[in-house]
Structures are given as C-alpha cells and as structure tokens.
A protein has these predicted regions:
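Accessory interdomain/linker segments of ATP-dependent helicases and helicase-like nucleic-acid enzymes
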Residues: 7-10, 280-423
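C-terminal effector modules of nucleic-acid-centric enzymes and ribosome-associated factors
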Residues: 426, 432-435, 441, 451-454, ...
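Secondary-structure-rich domain cores
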Residues: 384-458, 490-503
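Long, charged/polar, low-complexity intrinsically disordered N-terminal extensions
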Residues: 1-122, 142-176, 180-181, 185-188, ...
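Metal-dependent DNA phosphodiester-chemistry modules and their immediately adjacent helices/loops
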Residues: 116-124, 128-251
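Long, intrinsically disordered low-complexity tandem-repeat segments
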Residues: 453-492
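Structural motif
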Residues: 37-42, 67, 127-130, 419, ...
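Long, charge-rich alpha-helical interaction segments
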Residues: 189-295, 299-322
Length: 574
C-alpha cells in the first residue's frame, strides 16, 4: 500500500466517506456490458444455484437450479446460461476494421507487413466480486471439455453445442482477467477499490454493499456505520437485509428458507414422477417459490452492481485506457480466430514455454499499467513522487551542451528546483512526456546548490565557473562554482533542492534540438525514474526447443492433458 493510499484511508475514516484515489477512470467500461451475478450451493463445490444475467439493468434474466444435486438440472442451467451469454459474445465478432501489422514470412523468415482483421469492439463481462471471477474460471473449466452429439454420437450425456463453446470463452476471459489492466472480465469490487479508498481493510472491500456504503453513504450516515449495516444488519426473521454479493449464500437464508423450499420441491417432484394427482401443480408452485427466494438474494446485488457502474461512469476515462482496451480487442479477435479455425479447447495445463510467456506478458502489462496510470492521473503521479519514483519542479536554468562524438548531438543540462525527494543515483535514467505525447529520456547528473542555481551572485549558477558543467562530473567531486557531482553531498536534503538533468533523447536527429523539445526557464516539468513504455524480455524458445531443465520438448505420444483421470462411476453423476 502506497503512502498516499494510506493517507486517503485515514482521511476516509476522519470524514466518514471514501476518498478518491484517482482523478480519472483507469479501466474501460463498455457502453453495453453484460452483468453476471452468480450464486453457488453451500456444501456442493462449484454447484450453481442461480444467476442473474443480461445487458439491461431493468430486465435481467433469472436462471435457477431448483435442485443443485441433480446433474440433469445443472446441465440444463449451463445450457440456458450458454443461450444467454454466447449470443452476446458472438455479436461483436463480425464488425471488424483492418489493421497493418508485421508477421514473419514462413518462406523468407523476414518480417513483412500484412493486413489483418481487428474487431471494432469486444464484449465485456461484469461480476460483483473477485469470487465471481473465480467462479467464471470454474465454469469455463467445467464446460469446455463437454462432448456434444456431433463430436461423439455415443456420449451418454451430450451437451448442446453452445455449452463447450461458452466454456472456451469463459476460460479465455478468466485467463485474460489475470493480465493487469485487462477489461474483458471485471470485478466491480476491485474496480471500485482502485478508484476510492475506504476506511476499512482490503478484505472488507470485497463486500460490495459495504464498499458502496463507504463511497456513497446515505444522507447523514457516516460510511463506517452504513458499511456495518450493509454487512450485518438483519430483519425480524434473522436474514441479512443486504445479501452477500455471491457466489456464496447467507447460512441463515440456507437453513431457514432455502433448505425447506428444496425439500418441498423434492417431495413434489417425487410425487409427480409417481403420477400423484395434483403433484404437477405443487411442483410448479415449489419451483416458483424457489425462483422467488433465489431472486431475493440476487436482485439487491444486481442493483448494487449497476449503481457501482454509474459511480464509475461519473469519472472521465484516462487518456491511455483506449490503448489497453485495444489489446483486449486483439485478444478477443485472436480467440475468435482460434474458435473459427476449429482448434481444440485450451489444455488443462500449460507447457513450460506457454506458462513462461504468460508470466512475462503479465509482468510487462503490470509495468505498463503502473506507468500509464501515473501519466494519466496527477493524483497517482503524486503517489509515485511520494515514493521517490518521480519528481516535479520548475526549470531554473538551461545550459546548452553537446556530446563529444564525431557528430555532436545536443545534450542540454537542465536545472530543476523541486520539493520532492527522488531516489537518485549517478547516471540514473529519467523519462518525461513532451507536449506532443512523445517520451524524452535524460539522466541524472548531480545536485546543484539552490543559491548558486538561482544565480544569487548575478550570474546563472548552472553556467557559472564550475557550475552545472562541473556537476556533470561522475566522480562525485564538487565543482568550484558550488554544484556537487552525483556522488557528492549536494543539497539533497534541504528544502527546495535543485537537480541537474542531462537530456539524452527526444530532440530530433539534428545538431540543434527540435523546437519544444528542450524546456525553457520557468517551465514546470515532471521526470520519472520508471519507463513510460516498458518492454518484455527476450523471446522464449518454441515448445519443441524446451530445455531439459524444464521438462524438455512435449512428447507427442504422451497424454495431451496430463495423466488419465480415474474411470467414471455412478457416484460421479449424483
């Protein structure tokens, strides 16, 4: 937790209301997202109980499993879920735009430009909490290997074609959600807690009702009191007034209402199977009762989810959010192409190379996300400045200098007065954004005494004898004009310290820097110690070239998905 986040949480406790951590929204929100609010059955690992799903906040589709221990009813639920979600996922697949990218020519091995399709937009799924994201992954894992009648006419329990297809898409979305900054599958609690700091712990922020109570409390009610009500207030029957956001249910609801209703449903179903008169009507009433009970637990969470979306939409979108969303569109397009090409579903386990590629991609994405958020948001940048990872200040002197190469290049020395305390060392690389959006690089030279840098003796301290030009000395010696080298004592700990930065890039190819590429005296500048567009590491080998230290090349004769599972028994179909 950063210092500025800690301060914001303390401020939230004092004010009784969540405090903003950002000035802009750092995640993309689709114009028509699909909300998915699931519930699972207590005591049945991964067994769905019901769900609200849809793109219309006023008309969600309610799906239930009246008896989660019944395999046929669970499969019917998955089929209904596929009928509801898969058309939404497919609706973005055909509207495309052409993009030019470079690909390796298989004949020449050279990079050549090619025209490829990129979906103009991508579907977005919203779930209430991080537990909902985990349940989406679980659904994908349980659905994508189901066999259809077309694939295996002899399979005892064939699934509709959309069920394994939806499983593949949910698996892809679940994997994509692990990439920092991805917005294909979003947890609303994670999204809200990124943009607001509450007076409670991160674990307590996973309760959607409690989190919203801090961000938007009722009039005249402190956030802590409103959050406590949302977490634990019960009615006269002992039931939570604000049901949990799922997928787990409230034990009191399970014991007092759900279990008796399921017993009545089971009894009516048994009577109906025996042909008892009036049993069909009782079965319909029992199912309607279950639908009402499950809806009573889902609808408050559904409304809270859309309330959170409204709060997030009140923030303007960050400048670099569209760039990250484009990567999500590429990801969606690539998976669409794999599905259309008839490729098999994702394996249960990644091979060594694929796993390493995923980890490297996520590390790069995290570094890019951190940089983008700081560059888009002065409040986030303030946190980086407090952490010593950036500094901002006023340019108090500019001295033109050139490199000593055969073709001299401009290497101006910029003296910046700042109140920040960055973690600088000799020749540390620095980065800033120019007015046209390009990145400019520099390096830290040393500290300059503020009285000399300000030219109190009638001259520009940085250009006086032994000034900033002597500060360029990397041996840490002190120039006679009062500017210390990077290794010297300098004025690092005094108020209003002055730092000398040498520009090393972003000034064009000529001997003279391009207009606007060198800051002028009096300009406000912000330098960062982190790269603005970090890149990944070296390319990894093909799976066929996997070294023996990581298992060697995959064996074509070995099972594709690890060891064979135990044979199926009757207990597997309970």
């Amino acid at each position: 937790m950063s210092l500025i986040t800690t301060l914001a949480r303390m401020e939230a406790v004092r004010e009784g209301r969540a405090q903003p951590l950002t000035t802009v929204r750092h995640r993309h929100l689709s114009e028509r997202p699909l909300a998915f609010v699931p519930l699972t059955t207590a005591g049945e690992a991964g067994a769905p109980l019901g769900a609200l799903v849809g793109t219309d906040r006023d008309a969600p589709r309610l799906l239930i499993v009246a008896q989660p221990r019944d395999r046929d009813l669970r499969f019917a639920f998955l089929a209904e879920l596929a009928e509801e979600i898969q058309p939404y996922l497919d609706s973005y697949a055909d509207e495309v735009e052409l993009e030019e990218r470079k690909e390796t020519d298989p004949e020449t091995g050279k990079k050549v430009p090619v025209q490829v399709e990129l979906c103009a937009d991508a579907p977005q799924l919203l779930v209430p909490s991080a537990a909902g994201v985990a349940f989406v992954r679980l659904l994908g894992r349980s659905m994508r290997f189901r066999r259809t009648a077309e694939q295996d006419p002899e399979t005892p329990f064939p699934a509709p074609a959309r069920v394994p297809l939806l499983g593949r898409w949910l698996t892809h979305y679940g994997e994509r959600s692990r990439v920092p900054g991805s917005c294909l599958l979003l947890s609303l609690t994670e999204l809200l807690s990124r943009h607001w700091a509450t007076g409670q712990s991160h674990l307590e922020d996973q309760h959607l009702g409690s989190l919203l109570a801090w961000i938007d409390p009722p009039e005249g009610v402190p956030g802590a009191e409103a959050a406590l009500r949302a977490e634990s207030e019960r009615d006269e029957h002992g039931l939570l007034r604000c049901p949990p956001a799922g997928p787990a249910t409230d034990p009191a609801f399970d014991n007092q209402l759900l279990a008796p209703a399921m017993s009545r449903y089971d009894a009516a179903r048994a009577e109906a199977s025996q042909g008892v008169a009036g049993a069909e009507a009782r079965l319909r009433l029992a199912e309607a009762e279950l639908r009402g009970l499950i809806a009573s637990q889902l609808r408050p969470t559904w409304d809270a989810l859309w309330h959170g979306v409204d709060l997030l939409r009140s923030l303007p979108e960050g400048a670099r959010v569209a760039e990250r969303w484009k990567r999500d569109r590429w990801s969606y397009t690539a998976h669409r192409d794999r599905v259309r090409a008839g490729e098999p579903p994702q394996p249960k386990r990644d091979d060594a190379v694929t796993a390493a590629q995923k980890l490297a991609a996520r590390e790069t994405a995290q570094a890019q996300l951190d940089a983008h958020e700081a560059l888009d948001d002065p409040l986030v940048m303030a946190g980086r400045r407090l952490a010593g990872e950036a500094f901002a200040g006023e340019v108090i002197d500019v001295e033109m200098a050139w490199s000593e190469a055969r073709v001299p290049r401009p290497r101006p020395l910029i003296t910046v007065r700042t109140e920040d305390r960055p973690h600088l060392a000799e020749r540390v690389k620095l980065h800033r954004v120019l007015a046209d959006g390009r990145a400019q690089s520099g390096e830290f030279v040393g500290f300059a005494r503020t009285d000399v840098a300000a030219g109190t003796d009638g001259t520009d301290g940085a250009t006086g004898t032994g000034g900033a030009d002597r500060a360029a000395g990397t041996d840490g010696t002190t120039g006679t004009g009062g500017a210390d080298g990077a290794g010297g004592a300098g004025d690092a700990d005094g108020p209003g310290r002055a730092l000398v930065v040498r520009l090393t890039g972003g000034m064009g190819r000529g001997k003279q820097p391009e207009p606007g590429s060198v800051p002028e005296k009096g300009d406000r500048v912000c330098w960062t110690l982190f790269e603005h567009a970090p890149r990944g590491g070296p390319e990894l080998p093909d799976p066929e070239s996997t070294p023996w230290t990581h298992g060697g090349p995959p064996d074509a004769a070995a099972p594709a998905h690890g060891p064979e599972p135990d044979p199926m028994t009757e207990e597997d179909y309970l």
